[in-house]
Regions:
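N-terminal hydrophobic/helix-forming segments and targeting peptides
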Residues: 1-452
Length: 452
């Protein structure tokens, strides 16, 4: 018996590098095509239907049956009915598919000094200075005056134009450089260049007029239609291998799409689980899980209630016997900034999926703090299936903190623990993870779905 604990490195444990690299090719493709929650829901529906899943319409479950629900075009719930009834509990994995970004304001277009720009309002916890001087893609939907939905994506293709937020040249930035880093770029300075060619005529704001003409020509919209739109700017940067050994993935939105992809892929590769296996891709986590598609909303409770009613069981039995992984990322130990990490309690790149007993800040505020019994249960599931895992915390005590959806699920009476992938530069426009950890997340989630 080994008395001392030592974290395992995935590569040193003999895991097949080709298997890891092959798995991550699919992951990178997903990141490039699913930058927002709407795009995630669209692709999920296609993938699920191709895999034999059918839309759930309130019918009684059949063991082995594969079902899905798309809620408000942003939330995906996919599940496989287990051999046991749902009153015995459901094995649930919840991730989120929203990421920090720049949303357009309701009145986004304005002209100043013969330049048309777009006003933005940042979404989630961002370092604002990181969003300047990088290529940006515009994506989302416009609901026009007749209620028709118009999809917009500009900047994804290499043939498309991109958008750009300027920063000051260092030669003129003396005053800016004296600002505190938090205010180095202010929210109202995150204005994207939209165009510089004026329309014909002598009126004012002819560059803005020309942009509106282009939008009308392409999408048949007016400026008023932009008020009923959800348009967002995200990095127009492709997912890439990183490092001489190609052991890392650099990409936008890996918080939390790394857990979303691996949890859904694990479900798709699960056959006839003992208990019903449920994968949820939620929205609005980055702004507190508020709103109709966030995990504080009632859609999850209502879904369980309808599921229980359709199968003639008590919903409270379903809740009491279920368990959940809040599949969200943790901070990977970064040796360049080691002062903010407790090295003995921080997740390390390449050492597997991360269990996080609690998050929160200032004395664990805002966390569910998973009970020891739940930690032990997941630990056994992983060990029995040879999943390489580690424990992690979000930095040193009093250095900061954060939260996940775990607290909202646990508040409903379901044992929940955070379990995800360690990330470098979390919330940056371009984040980084270990390919080995991505693969172990898939392995860990698959083991959880199979648990009895």
């Amino acid at each position: 018996m080994e008395l001392k604990y030592k974290a395992k490195n995935v590569y040193k444990e003999g895991t097949d590098k080709e298997q890891i690299n092959g798995f991550c090719e699919g992951y990178k493709s997903f990141l490039d095509s699913c930058r927002t929650e709407r795009l995630c829901a669209e692709q999920a529906q296609k993938k699920l239907e191709a895999a034999g899943f059918t839309r759930y319409n309130g019918e009684k479950l059949k063991a082995g049956g594969k079902y899905y629900v798309i809620y408000r075009n942003k939330v995906t719930m996919a599940f496989i009915a287990g051999r046991q009834g749902i009153e015995k509990g459901i094995n649930i994995i919840v991730s989120h598919v929203d990421s920090p970004r720049l949303d357009l304001k309701p009145h986004p277009l304005y002209e100043d000094s013969n330049i048309c720009l777009l006003k933005t309002h940042y979404y989630g916890g961002v370092k604002k200075y990181q969003w300047t001087a990088i290529p940006l893609m515009l994506t989302g939907v416009i609901i026009n005056g007749t209620g028709e939905k118009i999809d917009v994506t500009i900047g994804d293709s290499d043939e498309d134009p991109v958008f750009y937020i300027s920063d000051l040249l260092p030669h003129l930035a003396a005053d800016q450089m004296d600002r505190k880093l938090r205010e180095g770029i202010k929210g109202e300075e995150l204005n994207a260049f939209a165009g510089t060619i004026p329309a014909e005529g002598e009126e004012k704001e002819l560059v803005k007029e020309n942009i509106l003409m282009l939008l009308n020509e392409k999408y048949d919209i007016t400026e008023e239609d932009l008020m009923s739109a959800e348009l967002t700017l995200v990095p127009a940067l492709k997912a890439r291998d990183s490092g001489f050994d190609r052991s890392l993935v650099a990409a936008y939105g890996q918080d939390d799409k790394v857990c979303a992809y691996t949890s859904m892929k694990a479900l798709l590769d699960t056959e006839a689980p003992e208990k019903t296996a449920l994968c949820i891709w939620a929205d609005k986590e980055e702004i507190g899980s508020m709103g109709v598609t966030g995990m504080q909303a009632d859609f999850f409770r209502n879904f369980l209630a309808r599921l229980a009613e359709a199968n003639d069981v008590n919903v409270y039995d379903v809740i009491d016997n279920s368990m959940c992984l809040s599949a969200d990322v943790d901070a990977a130990f970064d040796p360049t900034y080691k002062d903010v990490y407790d090295v003995n309690n921080s997740a390390k790149l390449g050492c597997g999926i991360v269990l996080t007993k609690y998050t929160g800040a200032r004395g664990k505020s805002g966390t569910s703090d998973a009970p020891a019994e739940m930690v032990g249960r997941i630990r056994k599931i992983f060990n029995d299936d040879n999943v390489i895992w580690q424990m992690g915390e979000l930095g040193k005590v009093d250095k900061g903190g954060g939260g996940t959806v775990a607290q909202f699920i646990a508040n409903r009476g379901i044992d929940t623990i955070d379990c995800g992938v360690a990330v470098i530069s979390m919330h940056a426009p371009y984040e980084m993870v270990s390919k080995a950890d991505v693969y172990m997340a898939y392995r860990g989630y698959k083991a959880f779905y199979k648990a009895k």
